Amino acid sequence: MRKNPEAILAKSGIDYFESLGYTTYKEVSLKGGGSIRADIFCKKENESIAVEVKMSMSLKIIEQGFKWREHSNKTYILIPKKRKFNLFAEQICRDYGIGLLYYKDGIFTERVQPSVTLEPKEPQLYEEQLLSDASNNRGEFVTPFKLTINRLIDYVGDNKLQLSNVISNIEHHYKDNSSASNSIKSMIKIGVIKHK
């Protein structure tokens, strides 16, 4: 089975930022798991960097980078270095404060420096994102909902327990236990959550 080239490039980016002392989180979402998701989110003390990884430059990746500017101190686009540079795309990145990193043969080249957001509205980070695969093409990413469901399943195991008892004994992302119980019951009913 062939490995996803974007995932290979992302792994190189992860190694690069980790060599600079950053902790890297993968597939980090805004607003609880929506479509705005950074391939790599780097943290070092109070500094944060969002990195979008693609195999080629496009308006879509520039838009993705643009959306992360207010949620990290710096935002980068990471793409493979080609023979010719897309000077127009580089100018758009420069105009919008999005950094541009090129990668080829183990070497990273910063062609555009990002602007700095001094007080970003950073996303919630989860320990499980440390172990995720960045730029995976399987749609795998961590959300508060998925974490709640995993905790629910782990807590229940093979036991037959009252849902209200389970809810009151696990950490969840809902406003209160009543809304958690109602939401989870409806998710079980429509088959989003599978039970034995």
List each model region and its residues.
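Short, contiguous strand/loop micro-motifs
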Residues: 1, 51-52, 139
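Short, well-structured alpha-helical interface segments that form or flank functional binding sites
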Residues: 8, 35, 59-63, 70, ...
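Conserved catalytic cores of phosphodiester-cleaving nucleases, focusing on short active-site segments
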Residues: 13, 40-57, 76
